[in-house]
A protein has these predicted regions:
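Beta-rich, blade/repeat-based domains predominating
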Residues: 1, 23-46, 62-64, 79-100, ...
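Short loop/turn segments that connect beta-strands within beta-propeller blades
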Residues: 11-15, 69-74, 115-119, 160-164, ...
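Predominantly a core beta-strand signature of beta-propeller blades
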Residues: 15-18, 75-80, 124-126, 165-166
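Short, solvent-exposed loop/turn segments at conserved positions within beta-propeller repeat blades
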Residues: 1-3, 47-63, 106-109, 151-152
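A short loop-to-beta-strand structural motif that recurs across blades of beta-propeller domains
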Residues: 5-8, 63-66, 110-112, 155-157, ...
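A beta-strand-loop signature enriched in Asp, Gly, Thr, and Trp
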Residues: 115-162, 169
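Short loop/turn segments immediately following the C-termini of beta-strands
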Residues: 2-4, 43-45, 106, 116, ...
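Surface-exposed loop and turn segments in beta-propeller and other repeat-based domains
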Residues: 44, 78-81, 127-128, 132, ...
Length: 237
């Protein structure tokens, strides 16, 4: 977990928590790979919430992906910059089975895909997997599709990782939200922001702004995460 740049490691067995790394700017998403190394995104060069939302009012290419390597001596003292010049780097997913890394570039309305060499921590061959409104957190489903939250559309979208085809798997979009989404997409294409569009009229009956999901296997329900005070449980059809 993380809090304004601090990344924590929590042991449920030992009931203990330690700070793994304190980043200068805010950390968005952190994931561990099979080598024990820690990857994390920096959405923008923010040291407070006001600056964070400033990067949602204007497209700024100061997002990045970092990797904190791990060895038998523990974590490195400083992370390696893997990818920079991203427009609000958000959620990402490490797919070691396919040697791919997927990443949400929110202020470009796109999901990127890279070839991954997990042993060296290197990425190559950046391409755009899919175009979608404001991609946020993501998870790989039990069927092998990439589920991505879209706050601006108030939906969860599923991306076929082979073709890039996008379908809606959870939809809480309102009529006003649909119009706000169209406005936001146009603004982002012009290098502008959409923070002022994140209103109660957009979120509708959701407890808060839709930002992610928790997935189980094919027989289990999934949960929709948001910035409110409740998870939404959804039974799979």
């Amino acid at each position: 977990m993380f809090s304004m740049g601090k990344i924590y490691k929590t042991s449920i067995e030992n009931n203990s928590t330690e700070i793994i790394y304190a980043h200068k700017y805010g950390a968005n998403t952190a994931r561990e790979d099979s080598t024990g190394s820690l990857w994390f995104t920096q959405s923008t060069e923010n040291q407070n919430e006001e600056r964070l939302f400033g990067a949602l009012d204007k497209a700024i290419p100061d997002g990045a992906l970092f990797r904190l390597s791990f060895s038998e001596d523990g974590f490195a003292s400083k992370p390696e910059l893997v990818i920079d010049n991203l427009y609000f780097a958000n959620g990402f997913y490490i797919d070691e089975g396919k040697n791919k890394l997927y990443l949400s570039e929110m202020m470009k309305n796109r999901v990127l895909v890279f070839d991954l060499d997990v042993s060296t921590g290197s990425l190559s061959n950046q391409t755009t997997l899919a175009i979608m409104p404001t991609p946020d957190n993501m998870e790989l489903s039990s069927e092998g599709d990439l589920w991505v939250a879209s706050p601006l559309s108030n939906q969860i979208l599923s991306i076929d990782v082979e073709s890039g085809a996008v379908t809606v798997v959870f939809d809480a979009q309102t009529d006003i939200g649909f119009e706000s989404m169209k406005t936001g997409i146009e603004r982002i294409e012009n290098g502008e922001g959409f923070a002022d569009l994140l209103s109660p009229e957009l979120t509708g009956d959701m407890p808060g702004l839709l930002t992610g999901m928790i997935l189980g296997d094919e027989s289990q329900p999934f949960y929709v995460a948001n910035l409110g005070v409740a998870l939404i449980r959804v039974a799979k059809k």
